[in-house]
Amino acid sequence: RRGKSAVIENGHIVVLGWSEQVFTIIPQLFIAENGLKNKKIVLLGDRDKVEMEDQIRNRIGSDALRRVVCRSGSPIEMSDLELTNLNEASGILVLTPEGDNPDAEVVKTVLAITKNHQRKSDPYKIIAALKENQNRELGKIVGNGEVEWIFSGQVIARLLAQSCNQPGLSVVYSELLDFTGDEIYFIEDSKLIGRTYREALSSFQKGVVIGLQKAEKVTLNPVMETILRPGDQLVVIASDEQGLIRGERGAVRDEWIASNHAVSKASESVIILGWSERGNELLVELNNYFPPKSKVCIVTDKFDLRQELEDVSSSLKNLKVSFEKKSILDRNELESLKLQKYDHVILLSNDDRTLTIQQIDSNTLFTLLHIRNIVEQGKAKLSIATEILDGRNSRLAEVAKADDFIVSDRLISLMMAQIVSDRRRNAVYEDLFNPQGSEIYLKPACEYIKTGVAVNFYTILEAAARKNETAIGYRLSSLSEDAKRSFGVVINPDKREEVVFTEQDRIIVLAEK
């Protein structure tokens, strides 16, 4: 029977499940470093083998099938799992299924793997995602140390919350998570033992130091005077493991370092258009990131949220939440919202079980085009963060000039591919998306260096270090609409190269909130 014979591969990657994630994860694994490049991928899905192969051929290319072996079966059936030779696999990715209760299916799949009587005695290396943060403890119990969990609902909510007042942040994360860009690596450098973290920052001409791993604990942007001890590892951003290039430290021009300090806004105002299961999580994250007395207005005609919002509002100390029941597809109703009085717009993909993913994205893009036109006509200055479900529609979001667009499944798929390559990366991502500790910020260049003069990145590193921050790159406003130039985002620049910054440009840093 086609797709029902056991595979004989070993050292392979097993992908369990069939969804849109397949078309992001497989190409990423093809170009991954850390020895994954030439490994076979065994895919177990609940579709006909030929159907899966045809879709892979059409969406990824014929060459993909030289490395992908498809098998038909259910990831929760132990007999079907045995087709994939799990005991010899170097990594296992559990995809999030479509349906009403995906977390339950993911948990059952993990149990089918770990409780199989034919399992190996050594721990598996499993990467899986749970949508609901309330299932975090259950995941830890079921995973029993064998699973690297991604809590996808919380990750997307946090990125939307962070992006809405930091245009370009989603591009920074895409650069860090996509194997076509620079990635996160861990290195031990005996030459830096006894030196400080601050000294380590400028030790490489190419390659950005972002943190330290001490005794299995990762700390991003640690105290600048932290001493490196034997066994400590640097957490770095580099093109690959050989991408760290030493060089003589370039001159730091003290006279070009600015002493300006940011003036925090007293409060923020955001309007959320659309609503989904991650809406409450988004409110929690906005409450974490926004100052007291900030305002949030939620607009949708799909649900009456008044009672639900009353219940959740008591725990939101920094937010005053209001609700309007209006259609976000109706131009007149959008204009009646007076968008110009808000600082930020978040466009959420509506939960609507009667629509396909493509139909939901079409509605989102339709609303986005209206918003952009209304904003331009009113000459309002506000940021727009948009959630897209299918990555193939991201090009359309670019045309509609979304400041940030977050493709939910693609982002989680990129994270899964990165973690199966090196599971230590998950600790870095958890730290980055945690409201406590250091996060990524895009701050005005004029807060660090004088604009209108040529400065190298060594000078920017020093300027950031004086604020107890770690600089990792910059964003040029003149390229903010150029997709081919990563919308102006440059991560891990050559530190010797000099750049002339303007008042509109941003320095990308790791900093405390």
Residue ranges and their predicted role:
Residues R1-K513:
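Cytosolic regulatory regions of ion transport systems
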